[in-house]
């Protein structure tokens, strides 16, 4: 009891530590637990974990030598292309509706031309003019509340610079801003998904000392933050801001969040599997549907994998032993039923499909963040003989002959900024998630019915009939009302964002992707799923306790036992009724924070032994501290309007 009192006291202190006057637009800085680590970005093999370590945990960054060489080579290709009169969108030609407007002719580094281009670039970064032609976009509020979202955007942008022509000074400053934790104030709307131009513009503005930023969580002007950290804004020179920056067209604001989504989705799916296995142990379920015979007859790879995973989690548990009825030894079924409800039997099919959708989502994300998405696309070392279409008169018009400091290559207009493959996979995953976790509420309700549990319970605590109450757990059951509400929201989030076709830029930009809305909905859906799983945890562990009361020698298997014992560190089996009101206050947030702060991977590899109680408490309470802020930020992003009437950005 003393252990629970201490844990709850820490929770109360952490929560009241939030300033009472904190505004709805409060800022959520990261906790830089990996600030002593440095990640090298190559542009070719960025991982989800690297994005998370940089964005969420404050890891520092650098780029590889090959990354720098590629970026410099692409810049040389563009400069030589202009000298050879190759039409280059956004450089010697305008952008957007001005795509046929000639900006300059000849050598871009000729003094008068260079002065013009540097001024245009500088004005574009300062948001006082145009960036490559066409409209300028500054976005639409509210501000992004989470530092991790902005850092994820910046990290993905930096990784992609391998495929664009960039001055080294620009690359170096972006690295330094990440390493010093300078996060520009970014507006969350004003992008249509065909290039997150408004959000990119906020980062570029900070690089020339314009606008506001957060420096390690403290808000100030961009110029002050750069000065404080010993950095210099980009200057209006050829060697600083330069005459060209192939930045346009990235969806890094959306893609960075998608990386956070994929990471959090994996943790949610892992916990879903472990808690479901614990529910099976609580119900005394039949493992028959998971076995090789029915699975091999219907060879859906992810469904079969899901079944095998559950079997491995449950291996060594009493579910594989005969359940003999002491009153009828000849009945080998005993208290285990022949068939469970569909919310149990269907899990491998439903969640196997969710894992399949997750796999596709992760695959598309990794392609996206390790690819060039600018317009135009520059590719050094390509030749007309590489492919038949490249050797046709029209395409050869965009070929740069080897000369000077470049080996030549193509500069071609592209639609690589279109995020449809990633957007579709995010929506498919959200739908699969809702299809799977509709069963969480149903499973918690089946434990009230002896038609499924084969044993009767009495009283509000669900004590087993016929056993002393003082040896049973008086802990709360899942909150069915809260689960119904969260599940309803999850199902609504599964509805896709309608396809958009809005006339902008004189019709050049006439379809929109709206990736920022899709990733926001998916992230909130994952969060909702974790809340549902956390409530199922209450039911599953309560019934694991009941099964142990029935038969103290029952084994639950290594991973379920480790997770069950860890949860009992936070929520002991026996609690003082006088603390019931306080305990009920955290009926929703405490189990959620336990799952958030203690990844299922901590237990899935567990062989045996007691959990590290101090570590479990610390991680749970740290997650609880941020739970409300996180929920508020995710909900705000997911509930923003989309479509007609919203602000859209110029096609890059």
Residue locations for each model-derived region?
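Glycine-rich loop at the start of a catalytic domain that most often binds anionic cofactors/ligands
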Residues: 97-114
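Boundary at the C-terminal end of the N-terminal hydrophobic targeting segment
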Residues: 22-24
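Bacterial N-terminal signal peptides that target proteins for export
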Residues: 1-8
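Bacterial N-terminal signal peptides
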Residues: 8-17
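C-terminal auxiliary extensions adjacent to catalytic cores
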Residues: 26-70, 74-82, 114-116, 120, ...
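Contiguous domain-boundary segments centered on the initiation and propagation of an alpha-helix
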Residues: 137-200
